[in-house]
Structure formats: structure tokens, C-alpha cells
Amino acid sequence: MNGIMTTSSHSNFYNQDLVGAPSSSDHIPGPSSQDQPTNNNSPQHHHQHDQSQTTHQNHPLNQPIHHHPTQQNQSESQQSRQSHHLQQQQQQQQQQQQNQHNQQNLASSSTSYEMPSIYQQFTGSYQQTRVPKNFLLENANYYTLQPGFPLVQAADYYSTPTTTSANDYQNSTINSIISPSFQMGSVSTPDTQNSSIRSKQQQQHSYQQQQPQQLSQSQHQSQVPDIFYTQGGTIGGYVTTKQQQKEFSRKTSGDQTLVPQTNSKLQQQISETSYSQQQQQQQSPPTPQKQQQQQHYQHQTTQPYGGTGFMLYSQTGGPSSSPVAGNISIPTTIATTGQPNSQFQFTYGSPQQGSSSKTNQMYLYQRQQQQQQQHQQPQSQQMSQISQLSQQIPPQGSSKNISINSTPTKSRASSITTRSGRQSRSTSISSFIPQPDYPERVIRPKVATTRWDDENTNCYQVRARNILVSRREDTNYINGTKLLNVIGMTRGKRDGILKTEKIKNVVKVGSMNLKGVWIPFDRAYEIARNEGVDSLLYPLFVKNIKQYFLTKGHKLKSEDDEQEILEEGMTRQREEVRREGRSNGVGDFHNEEEEEIVGIQEDAGPNTAENDVPGDDEEEEDDDDDDDDDEEEGEQDDEEEEDGSSTSMSSSKNSESKLLETRDVIKSIVEEGDSTTGNVSEVKYVHEYLERSPQSTAIKEEDLYYGSSHNTPLTVHKTL
């Protein structure tokens, strides 16, 4: 015994000044009352009292004890010496266990994550310096009863266990009011985490003898396998950031299926506990509580972050700003994870560093219980549950071991889901937008509008035979000069018709499409209808052309499409003519063509002669300046027409000579017979050659644009 006085580390040392707090002598069993009054101050009985106190430590605390009145007169020096003596015994036991555990770790260490020997020695010395850390939980609930510590936990997460030990734990006062600072201090200390399985069980047995109030807590501790207590432990709950990063990267690395074979004892314990739990599940019939737990488990798997139960905050109305220690361990049942027959203990704080084998074994233990629960369900439910878990649950164990340190993974997963949700929304919206099928080439519309700035109006233009015929929007006047050009009239006839018009508007300044003599709508429609070009100029003569242009103008075909239609019609006519020529004979067909050519040549002469007469009449009759300008233009056009007639005569003679030359060849082909395929092909070739000749095309265009001032193709073949 030391003669030096030291401060007591007993918890009653802090409770002596409190009102209603029991003294330390109430819980210390003394010797018999006969020897105590006489031998109270002798040094021998000090030694006897120490022996009696050590022998009577197995006496339960909640058992009624009858003390002698003189027992309360014990001095405070005896209390301090006794408590110091107990403290030294506890420290010696802790040092022995620490040394044994260090030797075991050095002997059986095979992984790269175990703690070095220097760090373990530091833990032992650090525990010696932190003497007031080992509290005896006699008045542990005092701090929770004060108004400054309203730490009432959510009782919903502790109401579903079905085992007897869980019921004992449920009936205890710790379920309703939990002290986060002193709840599991003597059970989940770093010493017990550092010890092996057997030493931990022995130490739990000694704690049960000293404090039987912790019976339910020790039962809860004995059910938890050692895989949740990593080697090395934590120093008073303080973990460095590097160790946290290592643990976090180890959890998220994904190497959860590889379990080392070093810890054979732990694997045996896992198999034994799983086998005993399987037997209990087979013996006990399915109760409605289990069915509710299974439904709750499926709901939690479908919504892993839906509820706040994983964060273990108070939901019963208590303030959320209550102080919580950093190294507390909150016992939670597996009601949230759907495993009723086992209880786990998660740390509400920094993660514990340790070897990767124990974390992998923790995941293996959970997977074994998942497989047991799945085998009890029907096969169809098992397949559906596997599909749901594979689609919706992140890596195994992440939704079941959620602490504050797993919030980075939660936020990362939520950000991924929101990002994918935004992508899915964008694709779904774009899928409903109608995608117009654009044509392969841009089609020029048949009806177009142009701005006439000089007249301050708009004009609608319709293209026919490569000529634009315009119509004013304000007065509906139509350019008669362009209209007569589409009809194909000569210069003289056109000028004669336009001069006889009573209502007209002569335009000499502007673009080529807008120059000419403008006549009213009714007169222009009458001329077009009489000449048969009203359908060709559609929709120029629609009454409400503005509304038609806005509604149906874009649907009209362009000039190119119109030319394609005309070419198709011409090819059909050619095929019909070929069929008729084969049936009647090729010679007769060419004779008919020659007769047509001769008729055209005979008609060309008098037409050119007649074109000079209106020009002379106009010079004699009209005296206006406009008429004089028209006369000059008419004279120039007449000269061009004479040149055109001469070229047409020469071209017709050349074509006639060529046709006469090829007549003998065609007759020889016809005499040989049309039955052979080669002869038929030769006939077709000759016929197509004659049609492709420039003379025949010139004749057709002469027939089409006869007497017009715009029949420029007739002047192209002067070199022939």
C-alpha cells in the first residue's frame, strides 16, 4: 500500500456533492457487525477489510444489504486507498491482456493492415495515462436525466426483435433513455476490442460479476461476432484522417468477395452462429412480425436512401442539436435490415481501422444471412428480389452499414441519379418533338412574291414556260405583255391587242419582270381563258390570291416538277407513236413527218409577211410617244423574225435531206423483217437519232413558239 494520497478515479468521487447521490459505502459490503465497532481504526483490520472487499465483489449490487450504523463512519482516506488499490489491479490486468494480445498479433500477423508494435505500446501507455476513462457505471443515467441532455432515441428501431435476450434488452431502461457518453463504455472499450475472443469473454464475465446491471448489455455483446471489432481498436475513439481515408477506400474498393484464410477461428464462429440461427428460424414458425420485417426489408432495399433510419437521428420530437460523443457505439437491431435473430453494433463516428480480412468477413457474414433468408422464401420471390437488388442496390453492404462517414458515397450516388434523371428527361422531351422530313433538294415554289418599291405594293408571280407573269396585290392588275408572251403571240399581234385596251397602265422603268403594259384582272382572265392558258397560269387568277398563297401556296409544284411531268407525257406519246409506227410501217410514219414539216414551212412565209403590216398601220395611226417607242421595238423584232424565218427554212431543208438519205436504210430494215430483235433495235436507234437531231427540236420549238419574239432557239442553229 502506498502512503501517497491520490485523487480517486471512482465515479462516486464526482457524486459526493450531488443531492441524493449514494455514497461509496452503500455499495461496499463490510465484514460482520461484531468485529467492526472495536477494530475500526487498527491497521490490521484495514488489511482484512481489503481482503473482504475483494472476496465480496461477486455480490450483486441490486440485492438488499443490511449495514451496521457504524459502517457509515468510514474515513475518506480508506475510500481513496481502496479505490486506488482497485485501480491498480485493473491496470495490471489491462497491461497483462495488452501484452498477451501484442504477442498474439506479432505471432499471427499476415496482413498489411495490422498495427505496428510501436503503436500498440503507445496504446497501452496512453490507457495508463487516461485513468478517469474507466468509469464504473453506477450512476451513468444521471446525465441523461438532466434537462441539458434530452437524448431520447427513436424507439421504433428497437421494437422488432424476437429473441429472449432482445426482450430483456428491450425491457431495460436503456431502451427508453440512452446515455451516449457512458452507455457501452465498459463493454466496448478499446481493451476489449484489442483482446482475443477468449480473453474478451473472460473479461465480460468479470464485468458481469462486478456489475450485474449490465446483464442485458453483455448478452447483446456476446451475440455480436468479433468481426465487427477490428484489430488495434481506436484510441479513445480518436482516428486520424489518413486512417479514415484508408478505411473508406477499402470499403469502396469492391474487393468484398475475397476472404483471407488466416483467421480460422473467426470463420468457425461465423459458421456456428449462422448454423444456430438457421436452426432457430426453422424451429420457429413464421409470425406476422417476421412478415412485416421482410416487407420492411424489401421497402428499404427498393429505397436505400428513402428513410432517415440509417442516420439514427431522433424522430420523437427531441432537439437534433443535442451533444453526441464521437466514440459512442449505438446498439441497433437488424429491424432495418430484415434480420431479426442477430444484433449488431455500429460506431456512430469515425470508422475503425483494421485489416481488410475482418471487413470482408463482415460482408461475408451478412451475405450468409441474406442467403438463409432468401432460401426460406418461395423461388419466385427470390428471383424478383435478386433482380431488384441487382438493379437498385449499390455494392453489397453499402446500404446496410451506413454511418456518417458513408455520406460522401450517398451524395455521390444521389448526384449520379440526378444526373442520369436529367439525361433521361432530356431524351424523353426530345423524343416527343416532331422531326420534319426535309426534302432532298430545295424546291423553288411556283408562286412567289416580290416587293415593288416604285409602286409601293407587293406582286404575286407565277412562272410558266420560263416566264414570270406578275399580279399586283393592291389593284389586281396583271402584266399583259408577259401574259401574251406565255400564250406565244407575235410582236405585232401582242402590240395590237395591248393598244386596243381602253384601261391600261404602261410601265417602262423597273425590273424586266415588271416592265410592260398592265391590264385589269377581268380582261387578263378573259384573254387567258380564250387562249387556253388559264390552267397553265394557275393560281394567278384565284380571286383571293393572298389567302391562297398563305395557306396552299407552298404545296404547289415548281417549274422543274412541271417540266418533269411534261417530259413524262412526251415519252408516253413517243411510245404510242412507236407502237403505231410498228403496226403501220416506218415509211408511212416518216412520210407523215415530212408532210408536217412542209406545212410548217409554207405557213412560215405568210406569217412573216403579215407581221410587217401591223407595224406600218401603227406608224400611220398612232401619234403618242409610247406608240413611237413600240414601233421602234416592233421594227427590231421584225428584223429578228425575218432572220429567224430564214434560219428555219435552211434548217428544214437540211432535215429533209437527211430524212431522204436515211429512208433507203429504213426501207431495207423493214423489208428484211421486224421479227428479229436486232433489227428492231436498229429501228429504235434510227428513230431516236432523228428525234435527237437539232433540226427536229428546232421544228418542234418553232411549232410551239411560232411568231413569238422570244423564240430564241430558232436563231441558235445558224451554223448548220
Curated annotation (Swiss-Prot):
Polar residues composition bias: residue spans: 1-15, 22-35, 181-200, 254-266, 313-336, 400-413
Low complexity bias locations: 71-105, 201-223, 267-304, 366-399, 414-433, 645-654
Domain HTH APSES-type stretches: 446-552
Biological process, per Gene Ontology: biological process involved in interaction with host; negative regulation of transcription by RNA polymerase II; phenotypic switching; positive regulation of phenotypic switching; positive regulation of transcription by RNA polymerase II; pseudohyphal growth; regulation of cell differentiation
Coiled-coil portions: none
Region span, Disordered: 1-111, 181-223, 245-336, 365-437, 569-662
Effect of loss of the gene: Exhibits increased colonization of the murine intestinal tract, a model of commensal colonization.
Superkingdom of origin: Eukaryota
Gene Ontology, cellular component aspect: nucleus
SMART domains: KilA-N
PANTHER family, alphabetized: PROTEIN SOK2-RELATED (PTHR47792:SF1)
Name of the protein: Transcriptional regulator EFH1
Taxonomic source organism: Candida albicans (strain SC5314 / ATCC MYA-2876) (Yeast)
